[in-house]
Amino acid sequence: MRLILWLPVLVVVLLMVTEGPAPAQGAPDVASTFRNIPNSLKEFGNNLKDTFESIPEATRKLMTSFAERLKNFRIPLL
């Protein structure tokens, strides 16, 4: 019974061992990383600007929908 339970574990361990080491990752090019930082910051700034510019319009739409709901809201009398 123990052999039957240990057999799948043994198979998995053997597969892991025969797979070998993982391939090494290439070293990153530091110079290109530093060259891309200004572009990344500019893109981030533009995205942030677009997001903040859309906030007033989204707030206006939300408040308008609340005002419409309140206009049609009636308190039931007891």
Swiss-Prot record:
Keyword Protein biosynthesis: no
Gene Ontology biological process terms, A to Z: lipid transport; lipoprotein metabolic process; negative regulation of cholesterol transport; negative regulation of lipid catabolic process; negative regulation of very-low-density lipoprotein particle clearance; triglyceride metabolic process; very-low-density lipoprotein particle clearance
InterPro entries assigned to the protein according to its UniProt record, in alphabetical order: ApoC-I
This protein's GO CC annotations: high-density lipoprotein particle; very-low-density lipoprotein particle
Domain of life from the UniProt record: Eukaryota
Keywords of this entry: Lipid transport, Secreted, Signal, Transport, VLDL
Signal peptide annotation: 1-26
Localization per record: Secreted
Principal location: secreted
Single GO MF descriptor: phospholipase inhibitor activity
Function per UniProt: Inhibitor of lipoprotein binding to the low density lipoprotein (LDL) receptor, LDL receptor-related protein, and very low density lipoprotein (VLDL) receptor. Associates with high density lipoproteins (HDL) and the triacylglycerol-rich lipoproteins in the plasma and makes up about 10% of the protein of the VLDL and 2% of that of HDL. Appears to interfere directly with fatty acid uptake and is also the major plasma inhibitor of cholesteryl ester transfer protein (CETP). Binds free fatty acids and reduces their intracellular esterification.
Stated family: Belongs to the apolipoprotein C1 family.
Descriptive protein name: Apolipoprotein C-I
Provenance organism: Panthera tigris altaica
Gene designation per UniProt: APOC1
